[in-house]
Amino acid sequence: MSSRLGAVPATSGPTTFKQQRSTRIVGAKNSRTQCSIKDNSFQYTIPHDDSLSGSSSASSCEPVSDFPASFRKSAYWMKMRRIKPAATSHVEGSGGVSAKGKRKPRQEEDEDYREFPQKKHKLYGRKQRPKTQPNPKSQARRIRKEPPVYAAGSLEEQWYLEIVDKGSVSCPTCQAVGRKTIEGLKKHMENCKQEMFTCHHCGKQLRSLAGMKYHVMANHNSLPILKAGDEIDEPSERERLRTVLKRLGKLRCMRESCSSSFTSIMGYLYHVRKCGKGAAELEKMTLKCHHCGKPYRSKAGLAYHLRSEHGPISFFPESGQPECLKEMNLESKSGGRVQRRSAKIAVYHLQELASAELAKEWPKRKVLQDLVPDDRKLKYTRPGLPTFSQEVLHKWKTDIKKYHRIQCPNQGCEAVYSSVSGLKAHLGSCTLGNFVAGKYKCLLCQKEFVSESGVKYHINSVHAEDWFVVNPTTTKSFEKLMKIKQRQQEEEKRRQQHRSRRSLRRRQQPGIELPETELSLRVGKDQRRNNEELVVSASCKEPEQEPVPAQFQKVKPPKTNHKRGRK
């Protein structure tokens, strides 16, 4: 009973479960610390029970178990039992727990935390933090490097001072490459011993030919390429500009006060001719219309003006030739051959014809670019399409889901389609079926087309300038205007038919004899009127009437298919 009683600490009052647990943990820690000391570190005697000392000494260095008797007796328990430890001063001096219950130093707490982290967490109520290892890189960064020391008056010292002052040092050989460290500069100088390429425009030196070409292309693209006789080689110049545009994506103006850039060679050349010039010089460069004197800045604008305002572009008469033709003289070419005046005039007229062709395409791309109508406003009629029931459409959709294709239902037709819309369009023009669909008809020239894309292309290419109504004041749609025009044509046909019938009725009246002079005049008028009717009303398919001679007027009237008239 003594051993069992000795295992549980005696308390003066009722104790809770947490207090008992904390005392057990403290006792276990004391046993571990005391096991590291000599066996005679704690020497005590129990006056009443000799067996207790042997059992306690035997269990002092044993591993801790869940059984309460295996725990080392705590200082609180020994105090309650009036047991005085022999080496109390030694334990306190070595950092142990004092009799007053003070907490151990931080070093021993960390050792206990590494061995039993969960118990540490339960005892002190602290959060369990993950074990972190110091980063060697961060420690290396914290170490401040000492500045390098170079010999006084050496190049390295000069380079170092320049790096400290400006942030970088340029290569003394090429003066084109900069480095931020002396080691990088030395590494560059090992490969910078070759012959340098010098730009003949600005004197800059580059190490590679590709770098020199890119430098000239990017910074000196406005300088033309000259031939041997200081003449501009235009094909080579355009080829160079084309290469620059392909690599850089744009051509920029090289004037200091101009920051314009262009994505086309024509726009760049047009800008270069006029950039930086005064109003007087620009006025001299304008092209004036020889009909009305209206000035234009470009040749294409003048050609469009001549085509739209003054009809087709015609050749200039001798008296009205422009000054550029009058000033042409017999100048020798670079090859020594003399070009004739007629050849120069022919070249000029060919250029005018080329500009006229350009003017045909130019308004469609520039002027009417924002005015292109949609498909609903194009002037053409659509033919009627066959109608299908919902059962047939559902069957077609099912076949497409199963077989991924559908065949034309008309006998003898082997057309296969992968969509219902494609089959519908095919059935509208299939000749093997019962449905006869019409054709797409252009309402501007009455031309018929099989496909809708064909009539659209025809209208956009042939009738590009007739997309819209001629009269801009009207607000009616094109369909209404076409209906009104058809009504007017029908009314005109009816009037002509009515006039012809009235003339026939008058000639067929019996018992009326006219004198020969009046009869001859009457017959001449009838002949002229009949000829006009044949020309105008050819679509009405009126029966042709032969001219009646004057001598047969009284004997036999002309035969007609009309049964109306007085008998």
Swiss-Prot record:
GO terms for molecular function: DNA binding; zinc ion binding. InterPro entries: Krueppel_C2H2_Zn-finger, ZNF512_C2HC, ZNF512_znf-C2H2, Znf_C2H2_sf, Znf_C2H2_type. The keyword Ligase does not apply. There is a cross-link at residues 18, 84, 227, 333 (Glycyl lysine isopeptide (Lys-Gly) (interchain with G-Cter in SUMO2)). Residues 12-23 have a biased composition (Polar residues). Residues 523-532 have a biased composition (Basic and acidic residues). SMART domains: ZnF_C2H2. May be involved in transcriptional regulation. This is Zinc finger protein 512. It comes from Pongo abelii (Sumatran orangutan). The gene is ZNF512.
